[in-house]
Amino acid sequence: MTDIQTSMPAWEQTRSLLCQYEPEFYELEPGGSLALHLGGEGWLLEITPDGRLICQMGMDMSDIQSLLSDGTPEDLGTDELAKQAKYYLQPAVAKARHALVKAGFEENTEMTDQYVAVTFQRPVDFRNLDEVKQAIGWCRGQFN
């Protein structure tokens, strides 16, 4: 049996209990990660089936294209759009960075053709649900 197969029942149970604990959680895809909006600046909390707690903020590439083109047909490359997206994200990320890193989160940047996101993630142990709930509450407190 693979690790994924053995962890799926634990995830299914954890997912169900977390949705009871925090009814605002929603699935990003059926049976997959749970997500929760954090505050008004666009932060998102995500809990993944493989045991990661992620706080992230991102921008859709089409949104940044619209901001930069201001109605002109100028076509910017993906790299330039990604640089500009990170520039727009920096003020909000800078406010949260110290607290998240101090709490054991690792910072990363994810980029695709569709979006750019700054993520802060740390592992959580589904066997200790109280600790997972505490971590969720702490994250909510940082952004509300």
Segments and roles (model prediction):
Residues 1-59, 87, 97, 101-104, ...:
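Charge-rich, low-complexity N-terminal segments
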Residues 2-31, 68-80, 129-142:
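Negatively charged, low-complexity tracts enriched in Asp/Glu with abundant Ser/Thr
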Residues 18, 32, 50, 95-96, ...:
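Residue-level detector of solvent-exposed, low-hydrophobicity positions
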Residues 42, 61-65, 124-126:
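Residues that cap or initiate secondary-structure elements
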Residues 53-66, 137-144:
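Short, surface-exposed, charge-dense and proline/glycine-enriched linear segments
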Residues 60-119:
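Short, internal acidic amphipathic alpha-helical interface segments
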Residues 86-96, 132-143:
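Well-ordered, non-membrane alpha-helical segments in soluble/globular domains
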Residues 103-129, 133-142:
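A short, solvent-exposed beta-edge/loop patch
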